[in-house]
């Protein structure tokens, strides 16, 4: 039956009851029996795991080398400061990351409103307390805020080529703007049918996104993920095999083809230089360090390479090519 999907009831009534600026109850009905549980659970999981948000990911504090330090004139230790900083709710408009500064001195509370913000960055909870300064105390910090999804522990963002400055502290980042999502299923009735369901979702956000918009976004994600199942005979994604980059054939020739003197050729092979591609990546300094290879032999090599349009010290990507063996 091609039109069997149209035989199912679709929810026609959607009731949104705001509880507060960040909390709402969304009710939808009617559903066929069991569908409210299926869709409610799917939407809840997407809401909690897949909504984009913003969180501080890196912090550097003047005079602090690691999170187990303490600051003179600051009531809280660094661990407590970082925990409080995670509670600041940021909202970035039109950008994915930003570096913010916070400088304050003098006795009193340091709040999120004390952070220096550009025009396209907003703090949703400006009264949130980060730390307390004693008389004569001061604090100077830089905060990196990024956009992301879900939860990312600090070690997962460490890269091998990371050039972070000493004293930069990585934070575990919880990007999700959803604080709480729950759902319940009640009985619903349409005319004489009483075997229907009503889905009620209680949603609380951190203020970055409205509860109603969060449900819309989650539904769009679910529809997009399920669309491929609607037509299993549809267009498949063609997998294009990545071809190996072309290598100049002359680079694959053995150094013996350069017709160097026996002395020079033996010196190169002793350094595991078997192909012309191996040779041109060496510099003059490296070759002069080769035992028994002097300036005269070096000049000979340079002249032969020049006759073929090559020089020493060239850089080759993807060398040696796959399958290349010693001659």
From Swiss-Prot:
SMART domains, A to Z: RPOLD (SM00662)
Domain of life where this protein originates: Bacteria
Annotated segments matching region Alpha C-terminal domain (alpha-CTD): 247-327
Keyword hit for Nucleotidyltransferase: yes
One GO-annotated biological process of the protein: DNA-templated transcription
InterPro entries in alphabetical order: DNA-dir_RNA_pol_insert, DNA-dir_RNA_pol_RpoA/D/Rpb3, DNA-dir_RpoA, RBP11-like, RNAP_asu_C, RNApol_insert_sf
GO MF term set: DNA binding; DNA-directed RNA polymerase activity; protein dimerization activity
Known EC number: 2.7.7.6
CDD domains linked to this entry: RNAP_alpha_NTD
Alpha N-terminal domain (alpha-NTD): region residues: 1-233
This protein's record includes keyword Chloroplast: no
GO cellular component: cytoplasm; DNA-directed RNA polymerase complex
Catalysed conversion reaction: RNA(n) + a ribonucleoside 5'-triphosphate = RNA(n+1) + diphosphate
Keywords per UniProt: DNA-directed RNA polymerase, Nucleotidyltransferase, Transcription, Transferase
Annotated Pfam families: RNA_pol_A_bac, RNA_pol_A_CTD, RNA_pol_L
Family membership noted in the UniProt record: Belongs to the RNA polymerase alpha chain family.
Subunit and interaction comment: Homodimer. The RNAP catalytic core consists of 2 alpha, 1 beta, 1 beta' and 1 omega subunit. When a sigma factor is associated with the core the holoenzyme is formed, which can initiate transcription.
Domain notes: The N-terminal domain is essential for RNAP assembly and basal transcription, whereas the C-terminal domain is involved in interaction with transcriptional regulators and with upstream promoter elements.
Function: DNA-dependent RNA polymerase catalyzes the transcription of DNA into RNA using the four ribonucleoside triphosphates as substrates.
Protein name in UniProt: DNA-directed RNA polymerase subunit alpha
């Amino acid at each position: 039956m091609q039109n069997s999907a149209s035989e199912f009831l679709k929810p026609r009534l959607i009731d949104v009851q705001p509880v507060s600026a960040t909390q709402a109850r969304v009710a939808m009905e009617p559903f066929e029996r069991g569908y409210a549980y299926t869709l409610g659970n799917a939407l809840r999981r997407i809401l909690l795991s897949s909504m984009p948000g913003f969180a501080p990911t890196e912090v550097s504090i003047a005079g602090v080398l690691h999170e187990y330090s303490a600051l003179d004139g600051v009531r809280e230790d660094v661990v407590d400061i970082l925990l409080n900083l995670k509670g600041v709710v940021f909202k970035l408009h039109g950008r994915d990351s930003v570096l913010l500064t916070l400088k304050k001195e003098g006795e009193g509370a340091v709040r999120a409103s004390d952070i220096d913000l550009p025009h396209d960055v907003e703090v949703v909870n400006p009264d949130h307390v980060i730390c307390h300064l004693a008389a004569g105390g001061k604090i100077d910090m830089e905060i990196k805020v990024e956009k992301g999804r879900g939860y990312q522990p600090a070690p997962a963002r460490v890269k091998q080529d990371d050039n972070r400055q000493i004293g930069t502290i990585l934070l575990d980042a919880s990007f999700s703007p959803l604080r709480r999502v729950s759902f319940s299923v009640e009985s619903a009735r349409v005319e004489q049918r009483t075997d229907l369901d009503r889905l009620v979702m209680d949603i609380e956000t951190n203020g970055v996104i409205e509860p109603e918009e969060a449900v819309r976004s989650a539904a769009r994600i679910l529809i997009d993920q399920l669309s491929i199942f609607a037509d299993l005979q549809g267009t498949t994604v063609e997998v294009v095999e990545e071809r190996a980059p072309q290598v100049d054939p002359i680079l694959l020739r053995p150094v013996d083809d350069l017709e160097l003197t026996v002395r020079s050729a033996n010196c190169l092979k002793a350094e595991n230089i078997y192909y012309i591609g191996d040779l041109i990546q060496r510099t003059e300094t490296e070759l002069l360090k080769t035992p028994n290879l002097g300036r005269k032999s070096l000049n000979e090599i340079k002249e032969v390479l020049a006759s073929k349009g090559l020089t020493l010290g060239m850089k080759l990507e993807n060398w040696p090519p796959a399958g290349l063996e010693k001659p």
